[in-house]
Amino acid sequence: MSDSAIHALAGSVGGSAAMALTYPLVNLSTRAAVQTKKEELTTREAVAKVIKSEGVLGLYSGLTSSLFGIAVTNGVYYAFYEEMRSLLIRRRGNTPTSSTSALTTTEGILAGLIAGSITTLTTNPIWTVQTAQATHATTARNASGAIETDVEGNAKKVKPSAITVVKEILEKDGLKGFWRGIGPALILVLNPVIQYTTFERLVSLLLGFRLAKQGATPTGKTALGRSSLSDWDLFFLGALSKLVATSGTYPYIVVKSRLQAATHKYKSSIKAVLHILEAEGVNGLYAGLGLKLLQSVLTAAFMFVAQRRIYEFVKKLIVLSAERKKLVSKV
């Protein structure tokens, strides 16, 4: 198994684990992004509203498609990002291992743009379905077709299944409907670019600082590699880099979410921005920002740690498997 494939597997599993841990925040932040200023709710009110109308499980609506989406997204992204990273490092004349020094800013941006663009074009249909699941609700009916109500007599709401959403998109917009919001989604390629470029720079600064404390310079054989970073290093660097990325690109996240949810009749990304500014002001482009920052920062922090641990675990399994084969061949 190639190093890039191991990174892809680790990113896929690590991202899924992080998503599962923080999914209620993912769900709430998506809903907050598509609500208008008139509908704006506090986090506590949003949680209470979901539980009242959909039950506790409403906080996990769309979880299955999200886990599938993040697994595919991270797998594709890490595969291409690591391939680009290895290629760029080989151009320096170095060996592309996990302990190789960090990418330069230009290299990080290039690797991120290529990996992010490929990933976005490939996985946009998955996120269109997930967003629709998380933001749409239909009236619950029993076996006889009668409307189900709660203790207060209000109609119960249920979330549509992924299959139901797929059918609705096909009936309404055809195949092109799965690429709703692709414009802002491609612009949002900048999010992981900023995230990973910031992460690489923070790694470089941290390792350089530690070398300076040892009285060495970060060049040649004395350079520390990324393998010297602790889990806490990865957690905080991952969180900080995601904070920077999400803060800078959030208005596009709002526009993309609204286009994918199809809860607002916007004909294009530009018209969506103009309509939001006219109806809700600048604050409309930052609807749900607090929740999104909390969710994305925690998800990224957990993901960076999980990805590294899974990567190391798989590498050890491969080494052990190779050693066993050698022993068997000698017998």
Tell where the protein language model's regions lie, with residue ranges:
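Matrix-facing interhelical linker segments
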Residues: 1-331
